[in-house]
A protein has these predicted regions:
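Core segments of cupin and vicinal oxygen chelate
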Residues: 2-54, 92, 100-108, 147-189, ...
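Short loop/beta submotifs within extracellular cysteine-rich repeat domains
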Residues: 23, 33-35, 53-56, 66, ...
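Short, low-complexity, polar/charged sequence segments that are solvent-exposed and flexible
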Residues: 32, 56, 76-78, 97, ...
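Vicinal oxygen chelate
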Residues: 1-6, 9-18, 46-49, 64-89, 91-143, 168-186, ...
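N-terminal beta-strand motif that seeds the catalytic metal site of vicinal oxygen chelate
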Residues: 1-21, 73-78, 124-156, 162-168, ...
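Ligand-binding pocket scaffold of soluble enzyme catalytic domains
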Residues: 14, 23, 31, 37-38, ...
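DNA polymerase sliding clamps and clamp-related checkpoint/processivity subunits
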Residues: 50, 54-62, 67, 76, ...
Length: 263
């Protein structure tokens, strides 16, 4: 591994859904993304394209995932120098391998794991350069990666060992407990982790990915108009940005993020 390899960077975001055609219509209208056919040979695959850059993919929720009780969901892929070494390490830390490892021609090697608290994430070693970047995300890009879990301290230790993530800042949310921000690079947050309230519905641990939009208030109206749900927000967070948590018409959770306007 060279210093240039982006170990621990989220590089791809994949929507597995019960109705790819309907989901494509929803997100292209909401985010302005275009789409193009992907490279998977064994099944239909669509790439989300923001400007000139592919930011993720769209596919039918696999039957085996449905049989395991998985609902439509977004799956984040994290770059690692070796998928096989990462799987071995993850298993030693208490994770389960759900899919793979497997090679995708011209793309790279991937696997899907479930962390010790139950959240699902994918690891990816690209054939060429890894997608994504570490600069401030622009409109239409994924900007924040949030883990709701049963034990955020244990979860951070797991991901720190696996991906090299570092703690950035811990924010006291009062009755909500600690919100632990983290990043790949000291001083540069890419997400947060917190303990999920016991009375909150859904799985015990899950990832939520935030998409940058120019106007979150207009976007949440559009979410509703397009058949989705606004679960929480819009609300201002401590740095002045505005966010909202949502669900698409097929039931996949996602979030919207508007950067604080410049003074």
């Amino acid at each position: 591994m060279t210093d240039a390899f982006p170990r621990g960077r989220f590089v791809w975001y994949e929507l597995m859904t019960s109705d790819p055609s309907a989901a494509q219509s929803f997100y292209t209208q909401l985010t302005g993304w275009a789409t193009k056919a992907g490279d998977l040979a064994d099944q239909p695959y669509t790439e989300w394209v923001n400007g000139e850059t592919s930011v993720g993919g769209l596919m039918q929720l696999p039957d085996e995932a449905k049989q395991q009780g998985a609902p439509p969901h977004w799956l984040g892929y994290v770059a690692v120098p070796s998928v096989d070494d990462t799987l071995q390490q993850a298993q030693g830390l208490g994770a389960k391998t759900l899919v793979g490892p497997m090679d995708i021609p011209t793309v790279g090697r991937i696997a899907v794991i479930q962390d010790p608290q139950g959240a699902v994430i994918a690891v990816y070693t690209p054939t060429g350069d890894a997608p994504g970047h570490d600069e401030t995300p622009g409109v239409g890009e994924f900007s924040w990666h949030e883990l709701a879990t049963s034990d955020h301290a244990a979860a951070f230790n797991f991901y720190q060992a696996l991906f090299g993530w570092v703690k950035i800042e811990a924010m006291d949310m009062g009755p909500g407990g600690i919100y632990q921000m983290y990043g790949r690079i000291p001083g540069q947050s890419i997400g947060g982790m917190f303990n999920k309230p016991a009375d909150q519905p859904g799985p015990p641990a899950s990832w939520l990915f935030y998409i940058t939009v120019p106007d979150v208030h207009a976007s949440v109206e559009q979410v509703t108009q397009l058949g989705g749900q606004v679960l929480n927000g819009p609300m201002e967070v401590p740095d002045g940005d505005i966010v909202a948590q949502c669900m698409d018409p097929q039931g996949a959770a996602f979030a919207l993020h508007m950067v604080k306007p410049s003074a």
